[in-house]
Amino acid sequence: MNFQQRLQSLWTLARPFCPPLLATASQMQMVVLPCLGFTLLLWSQVSGAQGQEFHFGPCQVKGVVPQKLWEAFWAVKDTMQAQDNITSARLLQQEVLQNVSDAESCYLVHTLLEFYLKTVFKNYHNRTVEVRTLKSFSTLANNFVLIVSQLQPSQENEMFSIRDSAHRRFLLFRRAFKQLDVEAALTKALGEVDILLTWMQKFYKL
C-alpha cells in the first residue's frame, strides 16, 4: 500500500469521528480536539514516528503506544461498566480469545477492531456528549484506525484454515453482540475494551 492509499484508508475509517462541514458551532467545539488528535496520529504514523510495536503473527503495527490506549479506557471505564446491567453475558468470551495462534491473531484482531470501528464506535459516537468522555473515546477509536490500517492479513489459499478459524471466533463474538439489545450491546462492547487490550498486549514487543 503506497502513501496515498494509506492516507485514503485512514481517512475513510476515521471520517465518522470528525465533524461534517455543516456542523453547528457547539458540535464543532465538541469534536475539534479529537479530530486534531487524529490528524497528529495520522501524521506521526505516515511520517515514520514509532511507538511500541505489535506483532500479530506476520502483521506488524508501529506508531501505537499501548499506555495511551489504557489511559483512554481508564478515563471512561467506570462510566461504561456502571451502565452495563447485564452481568451474566460476555461478548469477548474465552472461546474468542483463548489459545489464538500468532498466525491467526492478525485475522482476528483485524475483524474485531473493524467491528468496533464500524459498529460500536460509530453508533456510540453520537451518544457521547461529555467532552472528557468524547476525548477518551476518540483516542481509542483513532488508535484502532491506525492499527487496522497497518494490518494486511494474507489472503493466500494456504492460509484458508487459519483465516476460517479466526472467522469462527469472530462469529462467536458477533453472535453474542446481536443477542443483546442495541444499547446494551454497545455499552457492554465498550466496557470490555480492557479484555481486548489485555489480549492485544500479548502481541506487543519492545
Swiss-Prot record:
Expressed in which tissues: Up-regulated in melanoma cells induced to terminally differentiate.
Protein induction: Upon influenza virus infection.
GO MF assignments: cytokine activity
Signal peptide range in chain numbering: 1-51
Glycosylation: residue positions: N85, N99, N126
Keyword DNA damage: no
InterPro entries recorded: 4_helix_cytokine-like_core, IL-10/19/20/24/26, IL-10_CS, IL-24
Keywords for the protein's UniProt record, in alphabetical order: Apoptosis, Cytokine, Disulfide bond, Glycoprotein, Isopeptide bond, Secreted, Signal, Ubl conjugation
GO biological process: apoptotic process; cellular response to interleukin-4; cellular response to lipopolysaccharide; immune response; negative regulation of cell migration; negative regulation of cell population proliferation; positive regulation of cell population proliferation
Disulphide bond pairs: C59-C106
Cell location: Secreted
The protein, known as: Interleukin-24
Record organism: Homo sapiens
Gene that produces this protein: IL24
